[in-house]
Amino acid sequence: MKRLLSLCTLACLLLCLTGCHTAEQSGIPFYYCRDSAHYQYFQQDGVICGEKRDLASHRNDLDYALGLYLAGPMTEGLSSPFPKNTQVISIRYHDETLHLELSDLSRSLPDPEFTLACTCLTMTCMELLPCAQVTIVSADRSITLNADSLLLFDAPQEESTQ
C-alpha cells in the first residue's frame, strides 16, 4: 500500500513539473533597456532586461517578430532603445549569420546608444534563431555582434596593488 501511494505521489509530482516546464518555455525574451529611473548601477540587474513575449503561431516569422520587437516593450520600466518608427528594411540569414538593415532613423542615436540598441536587438535575434552573429546596418553605420562580444554585467572593478 505504501509503495502504491509513493508511486502515485511521484507520478503526480512528475506531471506537475512537466506542466511548469512547458509554461516557462512559451515566451521568447525580447531585450530592452531599463528606464534610467529604474536602473541602479552596481546591482545584479544590468541596463538590459528581457521581457517574455508570446509569438504563438508566428514563432518562425522573423519579419513579424522584429516588427513586434520594434513596436516596443509592454512592461513598465522598460523602453525601446530604437527611435519610434524604426523599421526593418531587409533580413538575410545564411550560415548562422543574420544580416539586418534598419531604416536610417537610428542616425539620430549617438554611437554608444546605437551600440546598446544593437546589443538588445542582437540578444533578441539570438533567442529567435540559432545565430552565431548578427550584423545590423542603419544608414552609414554597421555593427557585428556575437555572443562572445556581449558583456552584460555592470560590476565594479577592483584595482590590483601589485
Segments from the language model and where they lie:
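Bimodal "functional hotspot" detector
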Residues: 3-8, 14, 19-162
